[in-house]
């Protein structure tokens, strides 16, 4: 009789090997990840430090930065530690943690981007009613809903995925535990779960995406009816950053989770997963800081404050 689950750990084959080219690539990825963590941390700091950014729009942006930081922290530290130490094992509990947080953060970000699109719709199409249409109470409810819906999906995936038997097939050809990759190793019929997961992914991607498209369709119609060129420019400026982030996130997510099995390959999965877990979190703060004058203004004021504090400390030190 075949023994099941005799090995408690899984083996992550990783993203890199120890060739010279991959060592350079690893250092580049590590630099990108550290820059991503710094950029998102700075975005959160600026939003909470500058009272001019204490609006629902920037609160939602701070939640996006928090999700991106957590997404990077869920996968990269383990990948880097495995590469540096040569140990590729990950426990079932560790695998479960990654399986839980990835859908939690990815799914939460789907809904959060829809909430941000509604915020822009209210600001552009109904500026006089914006405080009512996007009250702080509604903003907090929407934020909590994004986290809870993502967490419900993550918990379901983690529990069901780890409940399958793995009869000695413990090598995961990936750099983190991801449900679609892991269920391929199960020595049980996973077709029902895979179909249910596919439907769930389609709903979690397409429902928010449809809301985003509807919001921007209404925004575009409102902008085209604006007589003032300056008002049009301001409306496009306030929405362009969000549109760019939506395009990056949904492009990678749809390519990853909505492709037929016949078009899947391990190498493609790794590349796309690296894009949305490492590169997208880097690009988000860059997009918002480059395109948003209010964020750039907050950064200048914060740097000015830091310089003044340093100058005062030096003056106090000299006077002693």
From Swiss-Prot:
At which residues is glycosylation annotated? Answer: 17
Where does the chain cross the membrane?
A: 24-47, 56-77, 99-118, 138-156, 194-217, 235-257, 271-290
Gene Ontology BP terms = detection of chemical stimulus involved in sensory perception of smell
- Write out the annotated subcellular location: Cell membrane
Assign the protein's first listed, main location to one coarse class.
membrane
Q: Which Pfam families match?
A: 7tm_4
Keywords on record? Cell membrane, Disulfide bond, G-protein coupled receptor, Glycoprotein, Membrane, Olfaction, Receptor, Sensory transduction, Transducer, Transmembrane, Transmembrane helix
Protein name from the UniProt record: Olfactory receptor 2T33
From which source organism is this entry?
Answer: Homo sapiens
Mind giving the lineage of the organism this protein is from? Answer: Eukaryota, Metazoa, Chordata, Craniata, Vertebrata
